[in-house]
Each structure stands twice: as structure tokens, then as C-alpha cells.
Amino acid sequence: MLIIALAASGLICTPPQGTDQLLARSERVIVVGEIHGTAEAPHAIGEIACAASEKEPVVVALELEDTLQPTLDAFIAAPDAATAFATLAGSTLLNRAVQDGRTSEGLLKLLQRVRVLKASGRDITLHAFQPSSIGRGDSLDQAWYELNMGFALGQARQKRPDARVIALAGNIHAQKTPLARYPDIGLPAAGHLPTRETLSFKIAQQGGYSWSCGADECGVSPSNVRYDVDARGVIWSPAEDGGFDGVLALGPWTASPPISGED
């Protein structure tokens, strides 16, 4: 009966294989790099956060505009799903000019997951770390943007030094070393965090689909198979000259469309 009750309340955690070993590590910041617009990535973050929140405070950090922080705070403080959804009205979570996959139905489910965990008494919060204080005009390389994003992500750790930070970002921002093919990026956001405290994982490309943007439009796009399709879970295999500590294999992706205007 207890298991049934926990399942009904959303308190049973189903994290990827290897999460226990990951959370046993001393590093306080875990960054997961994704291709935006899949159902699997935000779901995995929610379940890892669920498992972590059983033992310690957790901050779920998301690549969303920092100006959305009051909206996110109101969302997870809402007493029920309908009230929570109403807090999104008028925000870029529902009205985004470019639907690049970050504000997906999968993200909405992650937000609801965090809200339910918080309502149950878990010490868990959300933190938006896409900087709005600097643009990427012709006069500034993206390296400046990455610097600001790294600082904004670091604030999740500095404001809650007792908490484990679990962050979801695009693959480029999540890498800890420079990308030779993109010299204007310099050191990506995760590379600006203290090395001793930071782990970074890249979600494996195992086929399937994502909702992402190409040169001309945004929509459902196929993903190439670049990793063993049968692999699952947290896999420690350093890549990109130390840019990632391993991969998170979640299987073939399912495209997750933008959040609709109806709950």
C-alpha cells in the first residue's frame, strides 16, 4: 500500500541506471548537455533530481532566461497543476518567438515534477541561467555570452551551497573545454565553473527525433545514431579532451513539441 501511495503522489524516483554512483560523488554541480526538444532529456533530469532530493537539497538549473525566475518560482509554489500552468500566461515559456525546443512539453513535465516534489516537502528549487544582461551582437564574440552564462549557472551553487545543482543545457554550453571548430565560443559556460566541483555529461545520440531548429525552420528532426543504441544509463567515458566526463544514454529520442497554450 505504501508503494502505491508513493507512486500516486509522484514520490517514486526512476532515475537512469548508474544515478546512485553519480550522486555518491563529491562534485556538487552536475551538468547535462542535450540537443533541445526531446522528451527523454528533461524526464531524466527530473528523475535524477528526484533521487538526489531524497538525501539532500537540490537546485534544478535550466537554460531559460534569467528574467523567467519569478515565473518559475510562482509555478513550483502553486497548489495544483492548473494554478501552476496559469502562472505561465504571458511568459516566453508559452510565447517564444523561436521555438528551439527548450520550452517543450517535456520541459513542462519537468517543471511539474519539481513542483510535486516541492509540495511533498522536498527541498528543491528551480534556477534559470540564460543571461539576459548581454547580447551576441557583431561586436562581441559568443565567448562573452558563455562567460555570463557560466556566472549565472554558478549562482545556483553560490546561493545554495548546501544543495546539489543538476543543470540541463545545450551540448555546447555543457562542455568544459573549448571547441576548436567554434573559436568564437571560447570556453563554454560549464568550463567557467570550478573543475573540482563540476561533472558534465552529454546525452548520447542513439537515433530517434527531436524538436529543433535548422537554418530555415523549427520542427521535428531526425537524430543520427552516434552511440551504441542498446546502451543505457550513466556511462563514464571522458570525451572532447575532458569536455565531458561521460555520456547519459537514454535510448532513441522522442520529439517533444513546444508547450501549447492549453493545460
Annotate each PLM feature:
Residues 1-9:
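Sec-dependent N-terminal signal peptides
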Residues 9-263:
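Compositional signal for N-terminal targeting/processing segments
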